[in-house]
């Protein structure tokens, strides 16, 4: 029996967005193409979901709070 994993789709951490927080943003403040930033929301079920989706700049985290990743 062959077990298939997602290992082939794993990307280095440099491909995971480096986000932060902003007082006017209720989600994550993340860079977009062209150097602009935008407020985005990433859902999560468990704490281990968030580090696969986002990295946090200048703050601990990311962590899952009330179903959303936050820094």
From Swiss-Prot:
Covalent S-S links between cysteines: 44-64, 50-69, 56-71
Family assignment from sequence similarity: Belongs to the DEFL family.
Full protein name: Defensin-like protein 292
Keyword Disulfide bond: yes
Biological process annotations from GO: defense response to fungus; killing of cells of another organism
Keywords: Antimicrobial, Disulfide bond, Fungicide, Plant defense
């Amino acid at each position: 029996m062959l077990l298939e994993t997602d290992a082939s789709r794993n990307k280095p951490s440099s491909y995971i967005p480096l986000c932060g927080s902003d007082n006017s943003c209720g989600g994550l403040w993340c860079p977009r193409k062209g150097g602009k930033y935008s407020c985005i929301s990433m859902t999560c079920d468990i704490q281990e979901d968030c580090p696969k989706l986002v990295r946090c700049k200048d703050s601990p985290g990311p962590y899952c709070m009330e179903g959303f990743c936050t820094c």
